[in-house]
Amino acid sequence: MKLKAIILATGLINCIAFSAQAVDTTITVTGNVLQRTCNVPGNVDVSLGNLYVSDFPNAGSGSPWVNFDLSLTGCQNMNTVRATFSGTADGQTYYANTGNAGGIKIEIQDRDGSNASYHNGMFKTLNVQNNNATFNLKARAVSKGQVTPGNISSVITVTYTYA
């Protein structure tokens, strides 16, 4: 009987000792499912060069067009890329000049011959070919009326979406 009591007591002590040492482990699995994107150009600087007040004899006069490209590469498993343009508007089809030259607004157009203007909120969609897409664009300054000397500046943001 004493032996049974000792064995029972030892078993209870072992159960208590092991249950006191139990610790939970939590496994957390995380990750992200992303849409693959193209390699996009960083900031693009388009210089209109030196322009003169006399280049703008009346409202609507424009500077020479300056061509530039937005070339996207590595567009794997994509059919189309949409570029949406946004910035501070000046009227319905132009961007505001935030520089100190007076009477100037900025125009962005497609170089495909359509003369499509890409003002605030407008977009252009291209088909991806060989994992690449290039937006061929042009920019110029346009007179709103009397032009005064100063610098020209306008920041236009392009947001890309893929399909």
From Swiss-Prot:
Q: What intrachain disulfides are recorded?
A: C38-C75
Its annotated compartments are: Fimbrium
Tell me which domain of life the UniProt entry assigns to the organism this sequence originates from. Bacteria
Result of changing K138T = No change in S-binding
Which GO BP terms sit in this record? cell adhesion involved in single-species biofilm formation
Q: Which PANTHER family match?
A: FIMBRIAL SUBUNIT ELFA-RELATED, PROTEIN FIMG
Gene knockout outcome: Deletion prevents hemagglutination (erythrocyte recognition), although cells are still poorly fimbriated.
The secretion signal range is 1-22
* Effect on the protein of changing R140S: No hemagglutination, weak reaction with antiadhesin-specific antibody A1
Protein family (similarity comment): Belongs to the fimbrial protein family.
**Could you identify this protein by its name?**
S-fimbrial adhesin protein SfaS
Identify the stretch(es) annotated as Involved in sialic acid binding. 138-144
Query: What are the record keywords, sorted?
Result: Disulfide bond, Fimbrium, Signal
Known role: Fimbriae (also called pili), polar filaments radiating from the surface of the bacterium to a length of 0.5-1.5 micrometers and numbering 100-300 per cell, enable bacteria to colonize the epithelium of specific host organs. A minor fimbrial subunit, this protein is necessary for full expression of S-specific binding. S-fimbrial adhesins enable pathogenic E.coli causing urinary-tract infections or newborn meningitis to attach to glycoproteins terminating with alpha-sialic acid-(2-3)-beta-Gal. This protein binds to the alpha-sialic acid-(2-3)-beta-Gal and is thus responsible for erythrocyte recognition and hemagglutination.
Kindly list the GO CC terms recorded for this protein. pilus
